[in-house]
């Protein structure tokens, strides 16, 4: 569910940036950053081992990308694509 919400927030930020709606874009970016922080906080390093460490690195890289390039729609799309890949991987694991 958090991956879906993260994808929605990023899509909203992209649409707002493309439409020149800076306030709306900033709001969606803040939401995306908050979701990434929640995903990271939910990692169980004791039980998750290497997977948790890898996901932590991915989440932090995404957070850095959002922080460093908040106005770059191409970079936002890259993060959104990465989230979509993660979501698909989790769906495949539980299927």
Task: Place the predicted regions along the sequence by residue.
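N-terminal first-folded block
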Residues: 1-24
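Helix-capping and short linker residues that terminate individual alpha-solenoid repeat units
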Residues: 18, 37, 44, 88-91
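Solenoid-repeat scaffolds in large eukaryotic assemblies
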Residues: 25, 32, 76-79
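Amphipathic, heptad-repeat alpha-helical segments
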Residues: 29, 33-40
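Short, solvent-exposed, charged loop/turn and helix-capping segments
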Residues: 38-55
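Long, amphipathic, charge-rich alpha-helical segments that form helical bundles/coiled-coils
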Residues: 52-69
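Amphipathic, charged alpha-helical scaffolds that flank and support histidine-based chemistry
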Residues: 66-80
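Amphipathic, coiled-coil-like alpha-helical segments
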Residues: 76-95
């Amino acid at each position: 569910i958090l991956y879906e919400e993260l994808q929605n927030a990023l899509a909203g930020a992209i649409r707002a940036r493309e439409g020149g709606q800076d306030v709306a874009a900033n709001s969606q970016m803040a939401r995306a950053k908050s979701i990434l922080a929640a995903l990271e906080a939910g990692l169980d390093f004791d039980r998750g081992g290497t997977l948790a460490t890898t996901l932590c690195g991915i989440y932090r890289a995404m957070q850095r990308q959002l922080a460093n390039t908040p106005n770059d729609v191409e970079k936002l799309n890259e993060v959104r694509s990465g989230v979509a890949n993660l979501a698909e991987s989790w769906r495949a694991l539980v299927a």
